[in-house]
Amino acid sequence: MHGRLITVLLLTASSILAQNKKPLYTAPLGIEAYTFRVGFSKDPVSTLDTIQVLGFTEMEGNSAGRGADSFRLLCQARGINLISYGAGYEQLVKSPDSVAAQAKALGAKFVMCAWIPHSSLFNIDNAKKAVEDFNRVGKILKDKGLVFCYHAHGYEFQSYENGTLLDYIINNTNPKWVSFEMDIFWIRFGGGDPVALLRLYGNRWKLMHLKDLRKGAKTNASGLSTPDNDVPLGTGELDIPAILKEAKKIGIKHYFIEDESNQESIHVRQSIQYLKSLSTE
């Protein structure tokens, strides 16, 4: 009798605890199109079908070589919103109006740049030029109803004065015109702490790339890595729950799973399952 009572009480307690658990990841499921770069280069339509089947409703990327209006319709037919448009640095500097037109035709709210041209090590001269260009381009894009985000890529962690060149870029760009996308892999690879940077710069961060770094990987501030260093979320060095909690606190609403390995189809599925398994407790 007592044994049965204890069993019932334990089951009841477990049920209550399960009901009190809430999912940690509650944002729309997003994908960085570069993850399926091979598929998009061969068959964009089938690749969008795959993205739909996987459950993604948001995407960051471009028009995959098609007309913007045509690609937007293909995405919409599959319930996919292209939230962020990726543009090259030179393209942004030379033709910001053209970039804005393309982004708006695709329905994007953000324009993202992921690389500042530089030779050898990234330096203060590169950073100063980027600040000047970002402030100018960011204002143009804002006037057209878009948010410009610079995607830090790890090479910005060269020391400068009392911080790094990333600190210099963030502190010298106008918050009205320039925001940032955190790629947690590259932040860690370059020597930064994603959680600390989220806390330090708060709502300057508007977007996030979700990816994980292989345990024991050799890191540096080159901004360059090898495909084997990309692993499914939750299997690498990064504290994904802590990062997501801090990102939610500062108001990041759009997250894009990205995988630069040669096993993206397998890794993406594992990463989705991992995100769904996380709870607030």
Predicted features along the sequence, with ranges:
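N-terminal pre-domain/capping segments
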Residues: H2, A18-F110, L278-E281
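Active-site acidic/histidine proton-transfer and metal-coordination neighborhood
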Residues: D49, E58, Y89-S179, S265
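Conserved, mostly hydrophobic/aromatic
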Residues: I31, I51, M59, C75, ...
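Hydrophobic faces of well-ordered beta-strands that scaffold small-molecule active sites
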Residues: A27-E32, M59-G61, L82-A87, V111-C113, ...
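Hydrophobic h-region of N-terminal signal peptides that target proteins for export
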Residues: L10-A18
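Sec-dependent signal peptide recognition
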Residues: H2-V8
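Acidic/histidine-rich catalytic cores of soluble enzymes
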Residues: D143-E237
